[in-house]
UniProtKB/Swiss-Prot annotation:
Residues 10-73 form the S5 DRBM domain. It comes from Borreliella afzelii (strain PKo). With S4 and S12 plays an important role in translational accuracy. This is Small ribosomal subunit protein uS5. Coiled coil: none annotated. The lineage of its organism: Bacteria, Pseudomonadati, Spirochaetota, Spirochaetia, Spirochaetales. InterPro entries: Ribosomal_Su5_D2-typ_SF, Ribosomal_uS5, Ribosomal_uS5_bac-type, Ribosomal_uS5_C, Ribosomal_uS5_N, Ribosomal_uS5_N_CS, Ribsml_uS5_D2-typ_fold_subgr. One of its GO terms (molecular function) is rRNA binding. Keywords: Ribonucleoprotein, Ribosomal protein, RNA-binding, rRNA-binding.
Length: 165
């Protein structure tokens, strides 16, 4: 899908689509819950969750939620600049940069996030909980810890030129 405002192609990945049941006096009422990841393949990625009585409506709601939740992650040469560990509840995600040609070595939800983000080479390990929503949230917590060269130079009180030599 092409985003009309920025003319960027968006990558949409469905993480999970669950049929949930509510038991009422007259019987069971079914609805759907969708969890999606959206990215542009150039460093912007977001997740969204939507619930509706129809599966397609739940997916649409999760897409709009994901587009509102887009954030930028610094990518360098098709991978992250350094190793990070993200934790959310009991889910822990370890993400390591990899050399060119390694590919995306990651489990289900983390793989979908990395593909939507535009990362081509990464090593990842999901530890603890395997709940897909918590694993994705732990991945996004890890993205909050990623530092780019400008942030490192600013923290050290140096310019980029003196930092890189």
């Amino acid at each position: 899908m092409v985003d009309v405002q920025t003319q960027r192609k968006q990558i949409e990945k469905l993480i999970s689509l669950n049929r949930v049941t509510k038991v009422v006096k007259g019987g069971r009422r079914f609805s759907f819950a969708a969890f999606m990841v959206v990215g542009d393949g150039e460093g912007h990625v977001g997740w969204g969750f939507g619930k509706a009585n129809d599966a397609s409506d739940a997916i649409k709601k999760s897409l709009t939620s994901a587009r509102k939740n887009l954030r930028f992650v610094s990518i360098r040469k098709g991978t992250l600049p350094h190793e990070v560990i993200g934790c959310f509840k009991k889910a822990k995600v370890l993400i390591k940069p990899a050399t060119h040609g390694t590919g995306v070595i990651a489990g289900g939800p983390v793989r979908a996030v990395m593909e939507a983000l535009g990362v081509h080479d990464i090593l990842s390990k999901s530890l603890g909980s395997n709940n897909s929503m918590n694993v994705v949230k732990a991945t996004f917590k890890a993205f909050d810890l990623v530092l780019n060269a400008e942030k490192v130079a600013e923290m050290r009180g140096k310019t980029l030129k003196t930092l890189w030599g």
